[in-house]
């Protein structure tokens, strides 16, 4: 076998008959499979041992030679070679066909490759191949054209006139003769000449034919190989036949299909030997052709061959296709050994990097390691003995197991794995029971909950794999989310509630205003019940030893609460004392107003001071996230994970102490709710009256009513939130960010509000009751629509989002950081992304973590803030925006010159680590996951906008798909193709509007539909590509009008718009990587003197290479225009045929690749996974594996001789 890691590329092509025979170990002559009595394979049949090898290791068929010592012998009785039975997985056979047959892929695919090569229509080909017409191969003196079709009658006429003087044939033989006569060089010349003169349809056909002829010429495939004389038979173990327990047999469909081919082939041979009449032979040949078609691609032509129960049989093509095919089922998604799965339970006592592994599961997973250790410790005498000890679960096994799993990380994975945080490494600890214990803080990353979710465990076996798991995948290392660089391990639910409760302050708490010497005194007082957690107290500031306090402050008393003192103990010492949830307090220092000079206090002491002070807000979920981010910025990952663990412990402890529950009494009904409802009811009556008088349209009435009731709900919600007590448990839950929000509460205590009908339209009758009061039957019925729609939408959305992620990953999987600096001279101009007045993404967020492309100076002081190719840190970004600079050029993936992938400088910092990105990082996959993972949070619906009929703007997930597939958007905007001034806006016929733009040289008029809103005014100057009406721009058209840079920026802005409106933050660089992949190709307009074909899609780098070559030799360069491909199309157009074939349209991709003789250089990730190599990312990159090292240390003996021996 070939060593997987030692080959550099994979090439595919057509197989010649000689090649097929050279693969084969013998000809299969009989359709028999196995003998039903002896269950041995039949000789010369489809499972023959003489051809394919023995069924039992080291044993021939008749049993004369048994044992490994006869290795390689061929038995003289039965002719079977004595070898391993594994060869039955790799040895092929063949069938010598009695008549040539065409290969359905090349004849039936679109476009038909045979048809293009012969310049015949697929229909004509079909008539010939399936014996309906004759084709003229050699016209002789008949005056017929070559390749003319003749019907049976016409052929008879000519044959009577010119007996034996001309040649016309039927079936694949005729086609084969024509293919053998093709002179590729001659065809090429003719086609190149035709390109010069032809136009329209003839030109496109010539280009297509040229492509096929070029492919055959360059690949060394002979056209006649598209016709099969010999049919290969795949190894028997790949199309097995197994006995079921009822004595019946289950067999692969391929065996049935092969049997039909062999039967028909043998019958044809017999008929030919007998010299049967032509018509019978023809019929048999046609049946053979159909049998081979069914074997290669069943159902491609005519009705599929069916098995029992009318089920179409699975042919060779179906074995490769689709989710269950060879590519996706077995090559890209293998099941692995040393893995297990179980239900997860929460493990609150675990450290950040630990997980609990059930004992019996761990024992099974680490079995070989335990066995080795048992033998080494001489607890067991040999491996067999060790194995039985493990199976009996003897007591001594457990101690050894604990030893073995120490420091041996395992990987935990939860499906669906939407982003890279769906697989993380943990150090296992043994737990009782059968559930895997998971650390509560990593649940966010996995999107897991403990209501019965299951997780899979995988054991990294090699030392290298263990090292990678520990260094790169350990849960404590993965604190930041790769999509936006924010912490992903923020506490949730109980932990948030606990910390919120801890930092609450109450006016009426016991002993408010007590003053303590130091924190120990406070804790003692709290333990003895002298103060409560919420008591506001004073503590001598000097006792904190806080480095951020000034000398002045240290002489004063710090006003704080007991809970905050406990909370601050988990914060690192160098931080300011956190007394209020503000960035100022967190990042700089504790506000001075909390330091009180004891001499200034009045009679009532500190208590009096507190009575006049407002309560400080407690710390909610968002602020806890900010604390984590700040700790991460200032300290190592280890410190952060330790602090997280302490924060988790605090949260659980105090949420338990708080004992927060929800009862019916906590849901306070609003007293003046009825009054609000009555007021709005009157407004609705007024609108209805206006409508009845014909003052407003139905549309306006409906929108007004909906608006009135929405306003009613908002008013009730506002008043409810005002009337709530700050210590109300439901309020605390929603305010802290633990669970629920204002809207949930309004539905419980206020009113449910407006509901959507199944169509998505809002029903104008609101539900005025709340859940506390109970709904009427009608209200309940209306609300079921919404509930059902919600569930249906969620299910559809999940599938859609998953498919989007798959397409994104496929198009960007080969984008890897491959070099430090590509040396580009271009940059991307960035500024705020705004929609009207609404800010979508601020300038500061766009530049942080990127490399500058220009020198930025302070406009006033002229000092240099940053030079080109320097990283913009958060501090520098703040300096730039503070200086009033609103736009700048940065390095971007859009302008990166790297041939494959991107370079470090154009990408910027790695968001998952906060450091600069390293060569080998698979940034394409990360980008795809970052865009795809939040897909489930986006809405499905297209919004029905109020007021304007028929202008539905697509939003949410469908809009993202529309952008990445480069489709024509719904609600398309009109753009101007020239620069100039808007001269006139007038009504045109059919209620359309006409916008006239006058340029320097020409005037253009554009038609917009009557309902679309025009956003330009008469006299307004417009640029090329500027929008004239509201809506989305069609990106392909925009590319030709406004150019490459504008299109890139537009697509980036549109994607960000959708995500940010849903409150999802994604870094620009991910979108840039994806959009770059969509714009990798150019379409050749004129070929010049290069070898490129006009009209073909070429990679931008191949295009520039070809032109560079042309300039070098003073020849005419080619011209081309950029093309925007949707992600599906871009994936299929990739250079790698393995990647494309495993994505979609497998047969089409492989057909094309075989004819072109394509070679796959295995640059991407998928290709390498398919053939089983290490992927070329991370440590698998060649630059890391080709490191040579030499020993520089001196030999031990030499060192020892130089050291003095001391006692």
Curated annotation (Swiss-Prot):
Question: What is the free-text note on the cofactor?
Answer: Binds 1 Mg(2+) ion per subunit. Binds 2 Zn(2+) ions per subunit.
Annotated residues that bind Zn(2+) 1 are located at 60, 62, 75, 78
Q: Does the keyword Disulfide bond apply?
A: no
Recorded hits in Pfam families, A to Z, give: RNA_pol_Rpb1_1, RNA_pol_Rpb1_2, RNA_pol_Rpb1_3, RNA_pol_Rpb1_4, RNA_pol_Rpb1_5
Please list the GO terms describing molecular function: DNA binding; DNA-directed RNA polymerase activity; magnesium ion binding; zinc ion binding
Q: Where does Zn(2+) 2 bind?
A: 822, 896, 903, 906
The protein's superkingdom reads: Bacteria
Per UniProt, the enzyme's principal EC class comes to transferase
Q: Which reaction does it catalyse?
A: RNA(n) + a ribonucleoside 5'-triphosphate = RNA(n+1) + diphosphate
Biological process, per Gene Ontology = DNA-templated transcription
Q: Which SUPFAM superfamilies match?
A: beta and beta-prime subunits of DNA dependent RNA-polymerase (SSF64484)
**GO cellular component terms given for this protein:** DNA-directed RNA polymerase complex
Family assignment from sequence similarity: Belongs to the RNA polymerase beta' chain family.
Give the matching PANTHER family.
DNA-DIRECTED RNA POLYMERASE, DNA-DIRECTED RNA POLYMERASE SUBUNIT BETA
The name this protein carries in UniProt is DNA-directed RNA polymerase subunit beta'
